[in-house]
Amino acid sequence: MSAAAKPKVYGWCPGALRPMMSGDGLVVRVRAPLGRLSPEQARGLADLSQAHGSGLVDISARANLQLRGIREDAHAALIDGLRALGLVDEDAGAEARRNITLTPFWRAGDDSHQIAQDLAQALRGAEDLDLPGKFGFAIDCGETPVLQDTAADIRIERGPDGLILRADGADSGLPVTARDAAGEALALARWFLDQGGAPEGRGRMLQLLARRARPTAHVAPAPIAPQGETQHPGQTASGLLVALEFGQMPATTLAALADHGALRLTPWRMLLVEGARNLPPLPGLILDATDPRLRVSACTGAPGCPQARAMTRDLARDLAPSVPMGQHLHLSGCAKGCAHPRPADLVLTATDEDTFDLIRNGTAADHPLNTSLSADALRAAPDLLTEGS
């Protein structure tokens, strides 16, 4: 990656009270309690997006909603609207700490549900806990794990003998109960800070474990379970799972979905519509599990992101049918690779206005196999993606 291509790394994620400026206005991230929106909240968010922003809504890789294109002079009014909907914390510190990803398949009263409620309350009150902006918790206590590929620093899962608290990347952990899991998770977060895990306010658990021993009490075997079956649009026991094209939908689609049930947010850029069995076609929705767009990830790109060096989504849409079944294409506007931080089979990283590097089996920042591929050339000969592989 050339020095000119190096993107700016902020080290924190936007929130509602601490938004981030992008190329299309403010990005305001909404962390819905329990990762769930009631129909009233979903309609309210759609109205706020249209009134104060671009009318585009993203779902992030940590199961949060992002309102895009919010005008700076409308931010205060937006926050008032979010407060009325019960979708904003008391202060930016509490909002930043409450970085929880919850399995969308929780049931009312089950372990995941109880722990998520307790942990959210504990984090709001832990004013001394100055965690890095990207530090997060995953609660995945169902019989089959579904969040193993979701970024998190502290994980609460179901092990062979019950619930277990595990530092990300560790193959051992601390047995817990649903009652004490939240408190032990906070203790592990404090251990992370005490061990110097956040120099200059940044750092992740995986990096700390690579250079230090784990907590002395975390000795119970906790082999890292393989990720459960890849999630696709379709029927589940809890409702209908629907995907969003590149993780984005117009606010009108969000409002229309609310007519069919409460919405659960997922880290797969999908929504779970509680109790639904059928949905009409709506702009931005993918209902077919074989849709080739599911084999492609693409960030906002230019001009929506000031760090993107090229437009991304039109090209991603055009190339999707050429991505082989079972493979994934990540099209990134810069080397940060926000849309798909993990390695992908095929990666196109923008290096100039109409120029991309091709990387195979890597991330957007890895060394390219081919350079200076134009968007027109890729459209004309999409087999360039897999040629010689």
Model-identified regions with their sequence ranges:
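Internal alpha/beta scaffold segment
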Residues: 169-200
